[in-house]
Amino acid sequence: MCGAHFVAIALLVAAGCQTAAEFDQDDIQQTSKDDSMASIDLLQSRNLRESRDSKDDLLSAGDEERTPPFPSGVLKEPKVADSTMAAANVMRTEGEASAIKAASKNLNQLKSNKPQRIAPASRSVAGQVLHSSPDSDKSLVSVENEQLLVLAKRRRTKHPTAMMTNAVRSAEQHDYRLAPTESSTLPAQASDGQLSKQLITQKVLQLDKKKHVDESLWREELMTVDEVLHLLETFDKPAHPTAVNVHEANAIGIATKKLNYLRRNKRKRIAPTSNNVVGQVPHAQPDPDKSPVLVAKDIPSVLAKRLRTDHPTAIMENAARFVTQHNYRLAPTGPSTIIAATPNSQLKYHLPGQKALHLDKNEHAGDLKSLRNEESHTIEHILHLRERNDKSAHTTAENHQSVPEDWNTVSAKGPKLLSKDSINEKVKKVHAAFVEAFNLPFHQYPEETAMMLKLVQRKTKSSPNNGETYDAFMYMAELQQHSSHLRKLLGPDLKMLLGTDKTVLPIKLENLQEAYNVKLVIMYDLFFEFCHDRKDLVEGLPRKPKPNQWILKLST
């Protein structure tokens, strides 16, 4: 009887398991289309439900009674059918394939929506088929709007720097299209109206007027159609893979800048060069704006301090005025390098050019203009102009003095000296070099050179500002006791020191001695500079002091 009960219970349990399996299979087939993962969950839940240990399945029979355990041989773990597992695997594979297919479809759709370049359409201008230029407002390369922030973030800075700003501005304004490789698309037969539209669209608007083009192009130059076409042809010939706007902007800017520079400087004086003219090599003239000697501004006060007077005297003022206006460059010693026998063809091309180099534009501007605009000048007139220019090349028509030919005759007219201050060969050599180096403001006697050479060769107290130097000059002036002799000594320089016309000072011994003393003080400044500059000629000199007050010194 007990065995029959156990058999009935086993049959009921088996029937329930089969019904549950059929229900689960129908449920999986119904939900596989929505989500393949749901079938796996159902299988797992069913396996868990059927594989639970029978020891844990207790049937409640009240608080005290419990059902007896099932025999281990009756309730076994049910096996899942192979057909059920195969169906689940197929459904899972189909779900994954559907997801992959949908993702691929979305990716292809995104790729198909990217901006594509439109091929340029052909159009006809003035009877010719032309290809339209790429849109000047659309670049082949996109530029990020937030470049500044991106650069700052990458460089780990809080704010964009000026260099970043310039780089971003350049990247935004750069034209990434290749320059044209064939000739210009604008025909010469195009009408003015069409040219205006074409040129403005293709060329002018591509230029950055504020940053890449000289503003004089927009302010002064008005270009004709022919000039624009010529520029376009010039730009097309050397074209290479470089931005069009940069190439054209540089070319226009450079050409305009050169043109304006030539217009502004058409009357500027050009430094002469040494050219071979009619078999002779003329040397370039010294710069007329540069003197070999620098002149101090406070000469009267320096003279008053050195000569120990309370204030500058009239002689000191006259001497300072003349020294300031004097030209220290040597006047030309030879005749003009142009020979009258030069052929007319050479004179036609060489003389106007050489005249333009030598004419003083302040004094001979009319002559220069006539040489440019008129062709009726004769050879005699041009040679006359050249001769007049040679004479007026310097403020002093001729050199103040030259090297003496007869030293004994010159010494007899010179100032009185002490017996130890004799004129030897060394003095003659230094004196000749000093006279030939400058156009001296005052006449220099060999006796004066002998005394100054002795002073400059002192180991100490040789500076022009030294008190013993003043005493030596004053003593030499006092040796000249006769006014008639002093007047002869100062003969060439008397007007520069005592004045002229109504301002001339009385010619008396006191004024003559002061004038001679002033002359020696000024000349020693220049002689001191000359000796220290020519140490190959004057040897054994001490170290040159740096005077805080000076009258004349060399500019080199």
From Swiss-Prot:
It comes from the Eukaryota. Residues 1-19 form the signal peptide. The keyword Repeat does not apply. GO terms for cellular component: extracellular region; host cell. It is found in: Secreted; Host cell. A motif (RxLR-dEER) lies at residues 46-66. Keywords: Secreted, Signal, Virulence. Residues 43-76, 108-138, 389-408 are annotated as: Disordered. Residues 47-67 have a biased composition (Basic and acidic residues). The RxLR-dEER motif acts to carry the protein into the host cell cytoplasm through binding to cell surface phosphatidylinositol-3-phosphate. Belongs to the RxLR effector family. Secreted effector that partially suppresses the host cell death induced by cell death-inducing proteins. This is Secreted RxLR effector protein 114. It comes from Plasmopara viticola (Downy mildew of grapevine). The gene is RXLR114.
